[in-house]
Amino acid sequence: MPTFELNKAIVQKAEQQQFDFALSMIKLRGFGGKTEFWDHNLESFTLMAGLAAVTSRIQIYATAATLTLPPAIVARMASTIDSISGGRFGVNLVTGWQKPEYEQMGLWPGDDYFSRRYDYLTEYVHVLRDLWDTGRSDFKGDYFTMNDCRVSPRPQQPMKVICAGQSDAGMAFSAQHADYNFCFGKGVNTPAAFAPTAARMKAAAEKAGRDVGSYVLFMVIADETDEAARAKWEHYKAGADEEALSWLTEQSQKDTRSGADTNVRQMADPTSAVNINMGTLVGSYASVARMLDEVAAVPGTEGVLLTFDDFLTGIDAFGEHIQPLMRCRDHLRVTQEVA
């Protein structure tokens, strides 16, 4: 069950192990099943406000479910957490894809939203940027109308915005408006398989005249040997919650307008559905370190978002056994030696 104390322990460990950032997702209704898959979630902004107060270096990102929160409120909450964190805060914007999350509270705008959600998000981020950059907005659009709307104090640092688009529309939005774009890794122990997605993002950003890199998501399942790590992975697959995964598949098919290459379609692929196909690195500490170096070498990759089969032990294992073997993290050793 998620608690603040658990999340605090995880993020403080991540800071101690020199992780660069921590991001919390938002889920307003899970997938059910015997495991109650994602049925229990803390609210992202209030969680990250608390974590900002008990950390000192790590960057903190909260996720805004934009159908549930007016942009002016998000702008003010973000400015508040920026103050708490000393300028370490950023916002992940999600349009929303799982209809029951929003329908349960009367906020689903209709299934035509699937085809116009990035128009909605474009107006949303325009209001955010107005308020963060100038402290006021008079934006008038199809979805939002601001009348001398104000936010003060403004953030002390430029507010970073991230998004997670893999559809053409999602990438076009990120190219125009985001600072980074998240994408899923692909497959099991195929660290460079996401390269075409990163290349599409790079091309979209170049077309927009901006530099927007990809942050790729992988799950790490590591142990002292390849065999021990593989045994864990096989154990997890054997216990897959088929009822919850069936619900996910059903919901992923509701959007018929975004094309085949989307995060949600990848999540529902049966290949590695037990961990929603986020891309998985399974192996010894040395094997995982080597594969993460391969990830970092993919053109367009700006960073990696890691999740673990067990966060508390996984973060320590990463910091103590995997990260020291990674060539792409050599700069951390140099920093430690200088200090």
UniProtKB/Swiss-Prot annotation:
It is an enzyme of class 1 (oxidoreductase). It catalyses: uracil + FMNH2 + NADH + O2 = (Z)-3-ureidoacrylate + FMN + NAD(+) + H2O + H(+); thymine + FMNH2 + NADH + O2 = (Z)-2-methylureidoacrylate + FMN + NAD(+) + H2O + H(+). The keyword Oxidoreductase applies. Keywords: Flavoprotein, FMN, Monooxygenase, NADP, Oxidoreductase. Coiled coil: none annotated. Belongs to the NtaA/SnaA/DszA monooxygenase family. RutA subfamily. This is Pyrimidine monooxygenase RutA. It comes from Cronobacter sakazakii (strain ATCC BAA-894) (Enterobacter sakazakii). The gene is rutA.
